[in-house]
């Protein structure tokens, strides 16, 4: 059961969202996306990127021209650096169970083997997805944005899911860059889940 509220506030968007979250008013942010420049290619405006980067709960960013379709095929790129748990994957599991979706877990690398930590996290992820349809994919010599674009040419994806794993300043910069690059060509909804829920 869902409840929706309209709130008018004299505050910045991100500050208001943070205050609402701290007051336990919401557990998902849904945003329409349209770039501030008016160019169709610039999907994520600065508000959307800022909310995605700083939100303490999952954010679903929906392109302005998107017409609803059931998320039957979900793309979930991962570097396996996150210690996965059921709480972190709740949104994906809920969607997958409701729509009978299949999750494509995509790992992009430059030919390096997974570390011991990454292997353990991958195994944990496999265990968490054991009751839903899922496939693991691995691609070499591509960055994340290239891998996502190329994968979408092969499989009709209805939802892209990313984990915002901002442990350090460098990773935070990398995530913003990835979001901006993905936002340039994305025509499907993007669900971003903070790694610390």
What are these regions (language model features)?
Residues 1-29, 130-180, 184, 188, ...:
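Structural beta-alpha unit
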Residues 3, 72-73, 100-104:
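Residues at the starts of beta-strands that form the adenosine-phosphate
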Residues 13, 17-63:
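Hydrophobic alpha-helical segments and helix pairs
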Residues 28-33, 53-88, 184-197:
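Intrinsically disordered or low-complexity boundary/linker segments at protein termini
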Residues 42, 72, 87, 114-118, ...:
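Short, well-ordered secondary-structure micro-motifs
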Residues 44-47, 89-90, 119-122, 174-179:
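Charged helix-capping and loop-helix junction motifs
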Residues 47, 55, 99, 130-132, ...:
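Short, structured coil segments at secondary-structure junctions
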């Amino acid at each position: 059961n869902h409840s929706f509220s309209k709130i008018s506030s004299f505050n910045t968007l991100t500050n208001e969202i943070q205050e609402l979250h701290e007051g336990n008013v919401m557990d998902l942010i849904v945003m329409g996306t349209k770039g501030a420049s008016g160019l169709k290619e610039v999907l994520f405006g600065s508000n959307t990127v800022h909310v995605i980067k700083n939100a303490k709960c999952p954010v679903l960013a929906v392109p302005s021209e998107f017409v609803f379709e059931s998320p039957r095929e979900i793309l979930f790129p991962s570097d396996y650096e996150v210690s996965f748990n059921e709480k972190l994957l709740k949104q994906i599991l809920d969607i997958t169970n409701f729509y009978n979706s299949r999750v494509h877990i995509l790992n992009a690398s430059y030919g390096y083997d997974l570390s011991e930590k990454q292997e353990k996290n991958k195994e944990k992820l496999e265990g968490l997805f054991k009751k839903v349809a899922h496939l693991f994919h691995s691609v070499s010599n591509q960055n994340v944005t290239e891998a996502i674009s190329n994968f979408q040419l092969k499989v009709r994806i209805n939802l892209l899911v990313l984990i915002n794993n901002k442990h350090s300043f460098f990773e935070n910069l990398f995530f913003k860059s990835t979001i901006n690059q993905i936002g340039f060509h994305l025509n499907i909804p993007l669900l971003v889940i903070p790694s610390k829920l």
